Amino acid sequence: MVKVTFNSALAQKEAKKDEPKSSEEALIVPPDAVAVDCKDPGDVVPVGQRRAWCWCMCFGLAFMLAGVILGGAYLYKYFALQPDDVYYCGLKYIKDDVILNEPSADAPAARYQTIEENIKIFEEDAVEFISVPVPEFADSDPANIVHDFNKKLTAYLDLNLDKCYVIPLNTSIVMPPKNLLELLINIKAGTYLPQSYLIHEHMVITDRIENVDNLGFFIYRLCHDKETYKLQRRETIRGIQKREASNCFTIRHFENKFAVETLICS
């Protein structure tokens, strides 16, 4: 029998020869790992801070977008809003309010005067805009008038004085937009001859209105940057009314089948 043996010293020597290889393999480090270790810690942004900046940017963009939308809607309404119908009409009336149901042959002929005005009707908004140009007679002022049925207010802008006057809407004198539109269509078609009479209303200036923002879009559009005052209505009568005050001005207009002379006094 042959007994095979190994030299233990030789085995240990070969094991020692293998050790440098393993040590060399342990020293191999990827280059990118070295690059990471070389970064400045101050250049690394914390995750929480990046999230905060992201939320700030999102909120800022949302506010900017909301501002653009609201601003665009306001500018569209302010500059691009057009009335449903625009009419330029005239109304003949008897100034002295003499109405003859059956005029006699020897009766004097009735002397008619004429009011001409530009009427814009915003039917969906329940608003009437009336522009009275410089009248034929010097005893009446040109004016712009807004009747807002939603706000139940009337505003007069006297173009000579460049001042605004606001009073509660008088629905007994002012036709609703739908009815006024029908009247204007009939006048335009010639089915209604606008020969009518004149009524008088007397108003007194009271307090000044400092802020017109709450008076509705249309009255704000008419009266912003203008001196604006409240009016108090006195009794409206048919026929000539004696003028009790000398510091007055008159606006003649119509938004019904009859003409109205609005006397405004301080």
UniProtKB/Swiss-Prot annotation:
Give residue numbers for the site Cleavage.
R243, E244
Carbohydrate-modified residues are N170
User: Quaternary arrangement and interactors, per the entry?
Assistant: Homodimer; disulfide-linked. Interacts with SPPL2A and SPPL2B. Interacts with APP. Mature BRI2 (mBRI2) interacts with the APP amyloid-beta A4 protein; the interaction occurs at the cell surface and in the endocytic compartments and enable alpha- and beta-secretase-induced APP cleavage inhibition. Mature BRI2 (mBRI2) interacts with the APP C99; the interaction occurs in the endocytic compartments and enable gamma-secretase-induced C99 cleavage inhibition. May form heterodimers with Bri23 peptide and APP amyloid-beta protein 40.
Q: In which tissues is it expressed?
A: Expressed in the brain, testis, testicular sperm, epididymis and mature epididymal sperm (at protein level).
Q: Which protein is depicted?
A: Integral membrane protein 2B
Cross-referenced SMART domains, in alphabetical order?
BRICHOS (SM01039)
- InterPro entries in the record: BRICHOS_dom, ITM2
Q: Which residues lie on this side of the membrane: Lumenal?
A: 76-266
Q: Which family does it belong to?
A: Belongs to the ITM2 family.
Q: Does the keyword Secreted apply?
A: yes
Topological domain spans for side Cytoplasmic: 1-54
Read off the PANTHER family from this record: INTEGRAL MEMBRANE PROTEIN 2B, INTEGRAL TRANSMEMBRANE PROTEIN 2
What are the GO MF terms of this UniProt record? Answer: amyloid-beta binding; ATP binding
Q: What does this protein do?
A: Plays a regulatory role in the processing of the amyloid-beta A4 precursor protein (APP) and acts as an inhibitor of the amyloid-beta peptide aggregation and fibrils deposition. Plays a role in the induction of neurite outgrowth. Functions as a protease inhibitor by blocking access of secretases to APP cleavage sites.
Region feature Necessary for interaction with APP and inhibitor effects on APP processing, mapped onto this chain: 102-134
A single GO cellular-component term on record: Golgi-associated vesicle membrane
